[in-house]
Amino acid sequence: MELEIITEGRTPLKVPKTRGQPSARDPVFYNPAMQLSRDLTVSSLVQYGPKIVCDPLAGVGARGIRIAVELSPEVVVLNDLNPRAVELIEENVRLNDVEDVCRIENRDANALMHEDELAGRFDYVDIDPFGPPVPFLDAAVRTVRNRGVVGISATDVSALAGRYPRSARRKYWVEVERVEFYQEVAIRALISYIVRTCAKYDLAFEPHIAFFQRHHVRVIGEIRRGARRADRALKRLGYLLHCRECGYTSEREFDRECPRCGSGSVVRLGPLWLPDFADRERAERAASDARELGLEEAAELLETVAKETGTNPWAYDIHRWASRLGLSRVPSLTSVLEGLREEGFNAVRPHYSKRAVVKTDASPEEFEAVLTEVAGDSGCLHR
């Protein structure tokens, strides 16, 4: 295995030299494309100041060692079942001179979280698997302390985003189909599963920061103990009904016939987390911390996540809506955002899209009215 030394944030790391897309079959797994995700995690955790940290699926140790170096906790437990990964973790711990902070284990991740001497006392537990987090989630939410924080990643977004609805049904117990705001659905489906997993143990989950980035979903949030809190969290789950024909979307239940166009092409998505998937103050503070750490791309993404709060749990694709409405010209994203804001709506391009997509608190009817009006006097958007 050929190695190279790279630097993430302020942390040098010895990693496998990559040739092509990383695979679970690699001798030791490391995905350089996930550096931004790790930047976002470190930035988001500054405000919590975790002292006791668990990284049970550490790989080369990138995430956990970055936390050890950049956040100065008291203890970081780094674990991987792969002996070759453990050897590389040991090298990276020595490389960063954090032997006094890091404890390295070579165990099954679930066994570690259930049986470690610090089980139940962790301030932060990070679950970043290759694939779904489902096999590790029960142990993770139970090993963190009351009011502790978990960071959960899912890379099987093809399931969460509705491309493979049967897979989503089996793994996450959620009904999803591919819709134009599939990234939004994926984030909310994962949060829903975390909430339902916590509720089994009389635990409540509150998402603080969530994002969809490079084909994975990441959620960071707080665990609280108590059956009543768990009940309240469950009440925040619900369904979205979306018409494939006209794009109408609503949280309100209606018959399978769309109330806007009368089409029967309505899909029911859920149960999903329907409130904001981020806390505005937490996201803004994380953005500020990212900037102080010199992580500019992470700061910009977190600022956008903060701006998305207070909008609908879906998004509008300007091109698709213009086509459905038969508009002769497609208005620019900027003109649509400005038009919505002039009418008093919150409006932003979501963090997960580079296309002409809008998140807003405007209803479908209100969005249609603004889009139609703006199309009459705006320039065209060419893509």
Swiss-Prot record:
Q: Which residues form the Trm1 methyltransferase domain?
A: 4-371
Binding-site list for S-adenosyl-L-methionine = R38, R63, D80, D108, A109
Which cysteines form disulfides?
none
Organism superkingdom:
Archaea
Q: Which UniProt keywords apply?
A: Metal-binding, Methyltransferase, RNA-binding, S-adenosyl-L-methionine, Transferase, tRNA processing, tRNA-binding, Zinc
* Tagged with keyword Protein transport: no
Picking any one GO molecular function of the record gives:
tRNA binding
Q: Kindly indicate whether the keyword S-adenosyl-L-methionine belongs to this entry.
A: yes
Stated EC number for the protein is 2.1.1.216
Report any Pfam family annotated for this entry.
TRM
The biological process GO terms on file are: tRNA N2-guanine methylation
Q: What class of enzyme is it?
A: transferase
Binding-site residues for Zn(2+), renumbered to this chain? C243, C246, C258, C261
Q: Which reaction does it catalyse?
A: guanosine(26) in tRNA + 2 S-adenosyl-L-methionine = N(2)-dimethylguanosine(26) in tRNA + 2 S-adenosyl-L-homocysteine + 2 H(+)
What role does it play? Dimethylates a single guanine residue at position 26 of a number of tRNAs using S-adenosyl-L-methionine as donor of the methyl groups.
What is the similarity comment for this entry?
Belongs to the class I-like SAM-binding methyltransferase superfamily. Trm1 family.
Q: In its UniProt entry, what is this protein called?
A: tRNA (guanine(26)-N(2))-dimethyltransferase
Q: Which organism is this protein's natural source?
A: Methanopyrus kandleri (strain AV19 / DSM 6324 / JCM 9639 / NBRC 100938)
